Amino acid sequence: MGEREFIIYLDPQERLNRYRHYHAWQGNQIIEFRIQHEAFIGDEWHPIVRYDTAHGKPHRDILHPDGVETKEWFELYSNAETLTIGQSDIV
């Protein structure tokens, strides 16, 4: 099994938005992933949107300012496909 984790600033000059990425693979299969857009608001990093495989299935969480989370399941997509969709959405 291999793992990869990194952070990319989406606005390198201001450094107020970043893309956090983690994925694990076995052979040629993505077995787990977690990626999210985070924004620096009020002296803290806050997740805005997250794609991951928590709860056993790939999905997207939109994290609203009032604390409410909206969840969308990607049941018809593989982990690798959902990871690609999430990367395209965030970056």
Model regions and ranges:
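Generic detector of leucine side chains in alpha-helical contexts
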Residues: 10, 16, 40, 63, ...
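Acidic, low-complexity intrinsically disordered segments
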Residues: 67-91
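Negatively charged, low-complexity tracts enriched in Asp/Glu with abundant Ser/Thr
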Residues: 1-42
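A short, structured beta-strand/loop element
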Residues: 32-73
